[in-house]
Amino acid sequence: EKSAQARAFAKEHFNLDVKPHTALKDFAPGSFDVITLWHVMEHLEPLNETWETLRSLLTEKGVLIVAVPNCSSFDAKKYGAYWAAYDVPRHLWHFTPGTIQQFGSKHGFIMAERHPMPFDAFYVSMLTEKHMRHSCAFLRGMITGTLAWFSALVKKERSSSMIYVFRKKGGEKGIRD
């Protein structure tokens, strides 16, 4: 975890010893079968080095699961620069399904699966409406969230956030929705 405050919260409330992201270098290559990053990748730098480190830490059949906001989503397009999931300056990177697949490929991964996170659109839309100081922000956010949810039912790549499952190249091939 990059945030010292989040690490302290995890320790205080759950007695978890959460390490900073810089501790990745302390693990031996091939230490993990699965690594998960739930809304973390967009915060990490340097990005290329991080992908290489994650790859080295996985076993040969290891899996990398990454959940990130989708800047080509229905709600991102509706709100434009006001979209709350841009979360500048905390979000250093913004991904589309295509760009994250390219990053994975560049660093020796194939995208094995991708899944929408349909409920993120409700939260992000409500937060965006609140930040824009619109009246009835909750209601407006729920309406946009509902429209975004239906849009993602038709085309998963329109989901506000996506979960991507990567495998090292040489393992399972192709994308499964």
Segments from the language model and where they lie:
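Short hydrophobic/aromatic-enriched beta-strand-loop microsegments
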Residues: V18-P20, A85-Y86, R114
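Conserved SAM-binding loop
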Residues: E1-Y79, L92-F109, F119, S161-K169, ...
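Short, Lys/Arg-enriched charge-dense amphipathic segments
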Residues: E1-S3, D87-L92, H134-G145
